[in-house]
């Protein structure tokens, strides 16, 4: 059986890793769609799709998950929910089950006839992309929330400096002091 998981992964954190490990106990292969692939260089979406592919590939390898068990596919957003499932199906191998905690994603795939399962969330208050990015901006401990290989990717691309620089830009655009 092949499953599908869609997420922005901004950045890929330990909660994502636990969800993937849990899903891989139920399916033979997992398609991991990196959502909003066209977005980057903003506080909400600081990393490019390519950088997120690096994060996932390295983290899954670091945790002993064979590459033969998953596909990582960046997927750009489309602005029409009625066509979104078809868009995903066009870009991915066939799949049998969809894993999502997002009510809209659940609804769209269930209306298209797919079995949809809400994956367990692991310490959602701590393991969320929003919390990781907040800690990066506030010089907090963000590293402990991520697999070591993801920390290395973020260091390699100067990700924290990028987010802090973007925060200055966005404040100045709002008329604040930069």
UniProtKB/Swiss-Prot annotation:
Subcellular compartments: Cytoplasm
One Pfam family matching this protein: CTP_transf_like
A GO molecular function held by the record: ATP binding
Stretches that traverse the bilayer: none
Reactions catalysed: beta-nicotinamide D-ribonucleotide + ATP + H(+) = diphosphate + NAD(+)
Enzyme Commission number(s) from the entry: 2.7.7.1
Keywords: ATP-binding, Cytoplasm, NAD, Nucleotide-binding, Nucleotidyltransferase, Pyridine nucleotide biosynthesis, Transferase
Pathway this chain belongs to: Cofactor biosynthesis; NAD(+) biosynthesis; NAD(+) from nicotinamide D-ribonucleotide: step 1/1
Keyword presence, DNA repair: no
Top-level lineage group: Archaea
GO (cellular component) term, any one: cytoplasm
GO annotation, biological process: NAD biosynthetic process
Similarity remark: Belongs to the archaeal NMN adenylyltransferase family.
UniProt-listed HAMAP family: NMN_adenylyltr
Assembly and oligomerization: Homohexamer.
Protein name: Nicotinamide-nucleotide adenylyltransferase
